[in-house]
Amino acid sequence: MEPGNDTQISEFLLLGFSQEPGLQPFLFGLFLSMYLVTVLGNLLIILATISDSHLHTPMYFFLSNLSFADICVTSTTIPKMLMNIQTQNKVITYIACLMQMYFFILFAGFENFLLSVMAYDRFVAICHPLHYMVIMNPHLCGLLVLASWTMSALYSLLQILMVVRLSFCTALEIPHFFCELNQVIQLACSDSFLNHMVIYFTVALLGGGPLTGILYSYSKIISSIHAISSAQGKYKAFSTCASHLSVVSLFYGAILGVYLSSAATRNSHSSATASVMYTVVTPMLNPFIYSLRNKDIKRALGIHLLWGTMKGQFFKKCP
């Protein structure tokens, strides 16, 4: 088929991780378990933040938004992969592929911006503690989250519009478990040079900008902690941002690892395997990082579990 702007396609094939039939039940069980843990863990963080008045602070407001984004990122990719394994059908329609790309970029981009906002929140809390509640007022917090959603939505829309202009021929097999942007662009039989340039430019701008903000915030935080005289004061100050620093390291480290591994091996299946780190593993670990390191979250979750147990015992005794 000759490439051209009028080339019409209706579907792609998601090849997933392995073609071995014997591995499919194992992959289904593994990813279903990881997906359920991710959704449950992040839902508990959201419910604890909403229901406990002690957690109605800017830091936990941002954390609940991060948990929501984690649920959305995994829900964009994993259910479709599980359905494909269960039905032994690798087909995804062209429209569904575009929608999956749009929402994945939207939620992943939002996390990128939100982590920068959370770094700024920790910067204000440690470097300007007396003015923290004045600076991080509800209006500013809402505005920062709204701006993160808006920028991510516009970036995602730009990438989808760039894909729509491409023509596709007969090679419609995506060697991945979801419609990953680079993999889809590589299938195009029309010129995709502009697409790659837009990706490189926007990633450098919208990825490098927030990362620079995070590094700047933590440089100021480290300077402020270093100026504290007591060891207990230093530990208390550092503990307030340790969880966020762990999540940032995991998020950017996973993304960097994916692109370094794909550039080194040039193997699409290796890239798909590495992508599990930031699409599944990172969202799954985030609730554990925050709950294990945070006494307020553990207390709130403990109260809810205790209250749920007491209610269960009460209703069990009722005739």
Curated annotation (Swiss-Prot):
Keywords: Cell membrane, Disulfide bond, G-protein coupled receptor, Glycoprotein, Membrane, Olfaction, Receptor, Sensory transduction, Transducer, Transmembrane, Transmembrane helix. GO terms for biological process: sensory perception of smell; signal transduction. The chain crosses the membrane at residues 26-46, 55-75, 100-120, 140-160, 198-217, 238-258, 272-292. Residues 1-25, 76-99, 161-197, 259-271 are extracellular. It is a multi-pass membrane protein. Its main location: membrane. Glycans are attached at residue 5. InterPro entries: GPCR_Rhodpsn, GPCR_Rhodpsn_7TM, Olfact_rcpt. Belongs to the G-protein coupled receptor 1 family. This is Olfactory receptor 7A5. The lineage of its organism: Eukaryota, Metazoa, Chordata, Craniata, Vertebrata.
